[in-house]
């Protein structure tokens, strides 16, 4: 990597209420979850990924929410084939989140284009019908509010090839 221009984090008991928050005096405790959103630049191109870390034992709701965003990422990956749209990718991810107990997706989109800028067109949303073609680089970033004030978000990077999607980021473990 040439540099790592950003690192943002958030934490809270059993989830977090924002993935981008400033520092606090709060001490991490058993049952807390820390999210780190970071990336690097290599030869002018960005990567962007989120990782979740559990401190001690988390409750079942938190574990299930993490499982839902992880599985939602897999669903988005499977849907991201040439000729599909970013709406198809969003829908595949949202269906898994909704089945997993999502109350909402407060961000609205579940990933974005990636390249010489950190956030590029297109966006994985319900109303962005961009057709995926080989060479398109996307983040898959499903996020869900699963209880009041508790979110879970996951993010990976993919590229669309003639044969389907390929992971660009090293896949996070299935368990926090």
Residue ranges and their predicted role:
Residues 1-176:
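Active-site neighborhoods and metal-handling regions in enzymes and metal-associated proteins
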